[in-house]
Structure formats: C-alpha cells, structure tokens
C-alpha cells in the first residue's frame, strides 16, 4: 500500500512536511519512513489504535524527539533549530492534565499566559478563552475539583493562550463522553475558521469525518492519507450503491452486472432482493444502473449510495495492509 502523499503537492503553504521520517529506540522501530505534509489552515486527523505511533510522531514534529533518519520541516524549519520565537508559534495539548490542581481555573490560565509572555493587559483575552471553552462560570473553581471534561477544556484554553499558529492536539477527546467530544470538534472548527492549522491525533475512527485530511497510522507506519471521502473510496475501491429489486436478481444477472463497465469487482449479495455494487461515482452510475435493471426487467424498489461508517473503513484499510504483507 502506498503510504506517501504526493510530493508534487509540497509547497510553502505546508506547515508540516516529512520525508522518510524514522525513529527507532534500539532495535524497536517506533515510526517508519513517514512521508506526509499538512497544508496551512487545514485540520489534519492522525488516526490509529493506541500504541501505533501517533504520540511519538507528534513528539518528533514538536522537537521532543530527534529522528533516527529522514527529514522534517515544521513552519519552514527543522524543530531542532527552533528559537523561542519559533516555539511560541506552536500549541501542544498533551494527553495528561499538567496544570496546577491547587490553582483556580483563572489562575492556571493566567499562569500559562505569563509563561508565554502574553501582555500584562491580557484579561480580555483570558475571558474570551474561558468563554470559548465554556468555563467562565467556573473561573474560581480549583483545578482539582473540575470534571475530566472540564480539565480537558481548561487544557485547551491554556494551549491557545498565546494564539499559536499551529496546534498539535494529542488525543484531545480521549476519555470524554460523545456529546463533549462533538463539542470539542465544534471548538476545533472555530479555531480553523480563525486561521489556525490543527494536527489532531485520535483513536476514535469516526472523528475522521470532522477533518480535511486523514492519515491512517498502524504499527508505526502511515498506511494512507486522504480526505474523509477519499479514505472511504480508497478502502472500498469506489462508491457503494445498494440496489433493492422486487423480483430479486438471479446468479446470471449478477454475473452480467459485474461485466458492466461502470461496476468494479463482485456484486455483494445482501439478501434475496438486495445487492451492493462498487462504482466510480454513485451519482453518475445510479442512472446507468436503473437503465440496466430495466433491460433485465427488474423492478427497482430502492437504489441509493451507501456510506459505510469509518470504523468499517479503518478495518478495511488494515485488511488491505495485511493482504499486501
């Protein structure tokens, strides 16, 4: 499987670029030959199971780890050469809560602002951040008394306090309920609209739908990068169209359908009346499928594009990788 993004798309508008990026700890390869780029102003989702190398990759991109081999550029520079001013263009939300439990929400945010040298007249910005993460009414509450979701929101506010250009968010929605996870993605979309670029790691495969580009990571290797829709199409070989006919389709008719130029691969039998086919473009193929059914004297009850969940997409990608050795 091709794990590289097209190098022809590497431009000055990419805030992250890597080439054959590899990190080994002794004989253990944590990240292997990573090739990717992150365009400015996009949300790049980095998806994969726990332990696949997502956090390690983030630590490479932020300069915490030095690569064993390969090259990388973040905001036009190697992280090893970052100055203090360069680092202040980054925001990094780590998985653990690292703010001070005995300080209030406001005190924690104010301390983070002072650490980054934000103007002493920063009250207005801090208030806006608390409002953004919906913690204004909890400003005087000690951090140790916050719920897990509130702690994640406070951590996000602290990550944003210096208005960084590029945000690395490592498992920002881990361990929180689905409603709050959706709220976080609403935050991320707002940050994108404000001009920020976001690199978000997650093991919740369904969150791919919120991203502009998605990289699928597995066992230290980047399997593919595509848009959410492109990910589905690459996993299944095109769009899936479900056809339900009144009479049911015979074996010979299925064989004839597979021979049509707009159909790829085998027809999948769902039941006696329903079959799924893979096509290039569902919108273009559906009229042709209806016409074919008419020539076969099959009465179409329903015909529609099917959208498999991203959990199924991820499983399919892993199966493809296993089949390719």
Question: What are the language-model segments listed below?
Answer:
Residues 240-320, 325:
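Short, charged/small-residue-rich alpha-helical element at the C-terminal edge
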Residues 110, 114-138:
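Conserved ABC ATPase "signature" region
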Residues 187-200, 205-276:
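ABC transporter nucleotide-binding domain
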Residues 70-81, 85-86:
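Conserved ABC transporter NBD signature motif
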Residues 62:
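Helix-to-loop junction immediately C-terminal to a conserved catalytic motif
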Residues 102, 142-146:
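Conserved ABC ATPase signature
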């Amino acid at each position: 499987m091709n794990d590289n993004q097209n190098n022809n798309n590497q431009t000055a508008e990419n805030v992250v670029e890597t080439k054959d990026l590899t990190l080994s700890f002794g004989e253990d390869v944590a990240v292997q030959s990573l090739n990717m780029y992150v365009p400015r102003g996009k949300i790049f989702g980095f998806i994969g199971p726990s332990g696949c190398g997502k956090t390690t990759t983030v630590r490479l991109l932020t300069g915490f780890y030095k690569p064993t081999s390969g090259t990388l550029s973040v905001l036009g520079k190697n992280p090893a050469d970052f100055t203090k001013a360069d680092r202040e263009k980054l925001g990094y939300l780590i998985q653990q809560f690292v703010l001070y439990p005995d300080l209030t929400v406001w005190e924690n945010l104010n301390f983070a602002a002072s650490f980054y040298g934000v103007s002493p007249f920063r009250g207005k910005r801090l208030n806006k951040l608390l409002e953004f993460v919906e913690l204004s009414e909890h400003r005087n509450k000690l951090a140790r008394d916050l719920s897990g979701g509130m702690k994640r929101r406070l951590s996000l506010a602290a990550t944003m306090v210096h208005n960084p250009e590029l945000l690395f968010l490592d498992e920002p929605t881990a361990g929180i309920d689905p409603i709050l996870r959706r709220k976080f993605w609403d935050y991320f979309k707002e940050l994108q609209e404000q001009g920020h670029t976001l690199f978000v790691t997650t093991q919740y495969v369904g969150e791919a739908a919120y991203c502009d580009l998605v990289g699928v990571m597995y066992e230290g290797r980047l399997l593919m990068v595509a848009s959410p829709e492109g990910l589905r199409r690459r996993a299944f070989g095109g769009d899936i169209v479900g056809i339900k006919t009144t009479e049911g389709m015979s074996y010979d008719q299925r064989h004839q359908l597979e021979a049509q130029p707009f159909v790829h691969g085998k027809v999948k039998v769902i039941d006696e009346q329903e079959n799924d086919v893979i096509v290039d473009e569902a919108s273009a193929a559906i009229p042709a499928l209806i016409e074919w059914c008419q020539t076969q004297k099959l009465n179409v009850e329903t015909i529609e594009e099917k959208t498999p969940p991203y959990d199924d997409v991820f499983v399919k990608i892993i199966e493809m990788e296993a089949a390719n050795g």
